[in-house]
């Protein structure tokens, strides 16, 4: 079954924050800690961490597409975490909203405490429903800027190092993106024609590749005779319909991916910052590399891993599922889709798929 796609791309503030480059010619980077992570649908990375002195661990998504660090509003209410108006807003695919923030807090990772963090407050109830487990927050730029972070999708472990001279693994390639609060990488797209543009590298997006409709309209990169299908996605501000198609080739550094599932977003709130950025590459491609993210040097090292040649998922059902009150429930059904033709309706309870009755939404989305 087609994976429900969660596009989670935040842009904190309207201004651009540039990460200053620091030089550590003589001081080697030091390993501070390492810990396991879990993959959600689309390769999205889930880690557990503690907040201040609260003993119950929180579930966080590790997201290079987030311009800060944030908490779920329901989590702040449950644990009575104080927060105040920030006077700032976040921009997502379905809207713009003002956010509060909780100031001067500590994030406790296994073997590492990160202090003096300001957490923005957002409603992540839809994330919890999509993934079938409580999502308490997002870890983004506020964390990445402080360390060198190695993400190993073979061992399913994250290693955190101090800034300094770092010995990268042999092989692979070194990207040198433009680093604002989010990494922006020049890429080459080939379909009806060949186009070069900038794209965000977004580990929090559970998809392969996305381009804005404005980018496609202006570049005319897609073949017109290929008819996209409609899907529904979830992001900041609510739900939004999007088109799904295939691009002949997407090139990231020296690596070429062919027949790539591609989402087309009518980006009315310009969350993708077009025309400077054409869209994003998500973690269903990035998970095919072991990555080392080094904001201080403005470098990202990619090393192809055991998932590099995994097949893309081209399946399409036209249904979104959510985990609500212990049940897996169908949401909007795209008219004309296979789910629509099968007679599935909004609010139907999904008891099982292909003789699997596990009631596990993550499993159902991969069948």
Where are these regions (language model features)?
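Bacterial Sec-dependent N-terminal signal peptides
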Residues: 1-25
């Amino acid at each position: 079954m087609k994976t429900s796609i969660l596009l989670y791309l935040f842009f904190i503030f309207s201004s651009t924050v540039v990460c200053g480059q620091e030089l550590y010619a003589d001081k080697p980077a030091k390993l501070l800690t390492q810990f396991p992570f879990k993959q959600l649908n689309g390769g999205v990375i889930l880690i557990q961490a503690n907040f201040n002195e609260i003993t119950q661990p929180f579930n966080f998504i590790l997201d290079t597409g987030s311009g800060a660090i944030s908490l779920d509003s329901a989590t702040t209410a449950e644990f009575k975490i104080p927060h105040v108006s920030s006077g700032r807003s976040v921009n997502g695919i379905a809207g713009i909203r003002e956010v509060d923030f909780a100031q001067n807090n500590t994030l406790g990772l296994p073997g590492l405490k990160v202090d003096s963090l300001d957490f923005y407050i957002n409603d992540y109830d839809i994330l919890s429903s999509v993934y079938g487990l409580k999502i308490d927050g997002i870890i983004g730029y506020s964390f990445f800027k402080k360390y060198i972070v190695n993400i190993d999708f073979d061992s399913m472990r994250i290693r955190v190092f101090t800034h300094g001279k770092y010995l990268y693994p042999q092989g692979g390639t070194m990207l040198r993106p433009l680093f604002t609060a989010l990494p922006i990488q020049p890429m080459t797209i080939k379909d009806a024609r060949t186009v070069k543009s900038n794209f965000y590298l977004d580990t929090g997006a559970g998809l392969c590749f996305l381009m804005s409709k404005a980018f496609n309209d202006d570049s005319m990169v897609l073949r017109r005779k290929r008819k996209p299908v409609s899907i529904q996605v979830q992001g900041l501000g609510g739900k939004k319909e999007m088109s799904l198609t295939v691009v002949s080739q997407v090139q990231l550094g020296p690596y070429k991916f062919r027949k790539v599932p591609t989402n087309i977003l009518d980006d009315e709130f310009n969350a993708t910052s077009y025309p400077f950025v054409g869209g994003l590459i998500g973690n269903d491609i990035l998970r095919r590399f072991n990555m080392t993210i080094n904001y201080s040097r403005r470098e990202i090292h990619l090393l192809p891993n055991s998932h590099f040649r995994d097949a893309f998922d081209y399946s399409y059902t036209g249904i979104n599922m959510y985990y609500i009150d212990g049940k897996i429930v169908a949401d909007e059904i795209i008219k004309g889709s296979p789910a629509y033709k099968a007679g599935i309706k909004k609010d139907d309870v999904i008891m099982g798929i292909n003789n699997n009755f596990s009631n596990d939404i993550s499993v159902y989305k991969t069948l």
